[in-house]
């Protein structure tokens, strides 16, 4: 019947519009990485987030929670895109501030490829992941699911400076370098891939 036909046509149009919308949304928000590369980025950045989060949790008191941004991927089209993450620190007073974002006309760096992590595939096509230790040496963490002891940071000047700035300009309160750390701080990891904002 005509009504049935009209319904089918309307549903078809709706389907096309919705899938087109989802496709466009993904194209605009999700980076275009092959599944293998996406897996490498997610594995590597999960370890980097653990490295950064553990350092903040173990070396700063006054931290309620550390929450990571998605993995922002920029400069697509090359074999390896640039990518970075930004941790947000919550203090005990309900304030939160994100590392790697502008503080009073100063631009601290984000945490990403080359500066903090090296991602690649070896000759056999296996994941090759290096993190930097406290002295800036590369530590191979390719086979690790959790941060190995030798990749733990004992000092991290970039993080320290960034947190000092955030406290100085009142974005965070009473987040202090302290070897007692914040043992009860929660760390929220995020391995979603997203298009970068730079």
Where would I find each of the regions flagged by the language model?
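N-terminal Sec-pathway targeting helices
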Residues: 1-17, 26
